[in-house]
Amino acid sequence: MFQGASALTLDAKGRMSIPSRHREALQLQAEGRVTVTKHPDGCLMLFPRPEWERFRERIAALPMEAHWWKRIFLGSAADVELDTAGRVLITPELRAAASLERDVMLLGMGSHFEVWDAATYTAKEQAAMAQGMPDALKNFSF
């Protein structure tokens, strides 16, 4: 299970260094193989390959009215491997789709990660906090 936020920097080639606390889990769970694709909220999702296979099967089973989302998720997916330095290459197309230039946030979301442009993430987080909690969380005990 992946959790926590990490402020990271993309290098000139578009590579992102996976924090050491997650590298071992990715090596054990997926032999360093991951898949990156678009997320509907404007960020990217980074899956260990076995989790991606489960997600891909769920997407492929969606009804015909979701065909554009199948294209978005599956058509933009990129299979990559952690290099010897623990970095993942984000393709130029995916970097452009998520407006990733230099400063990024990597968020552990349980079974996968989200990769956000740092400024976009901060703005969206502040907007969510300003709106208050949704009804689904009103009775949640902290």
Swiss-Prot record:
SpoVT-AbrB domain: residues covered: 5-51, 77-120
Matching SUPFAM superfamilies: AbrB/MazE/MraZ-like
Keywords: Cytoplasm, DNA-binding, Repeat, Transcription, Transcription regulation
GO terms under cellular component: cytoplasm; nucleoid
GO MF assignments: DNA-binding transcription factor activity; transcription cis-regulatory region binding
Claim: Iron-sulfur is one of the keywords in the record: no
Cellular compartments annotated: Cytoplasm, Nucleoid
Pfam families given in the database record: MraZ
CDD domains per UniProt: MraZ_C, MraZ_N
Record flagged with keyword Cytoplasm: yes
BP GO annotations: negative regulation of DNA-templated transcription initiation
Primary site of residence: cytoplasm
Domain of life per record: Bacteria
Record text on subunit structure and interactions: Forms oligomers.
Family per similarity comment: Belongs to the MraZ family.
HAMAP family, per database record: MraZ
Protein name listed in UniProt: Transcriptional regulator MraZ
Species of the source: Ralstonia pickettii (strain 12J)
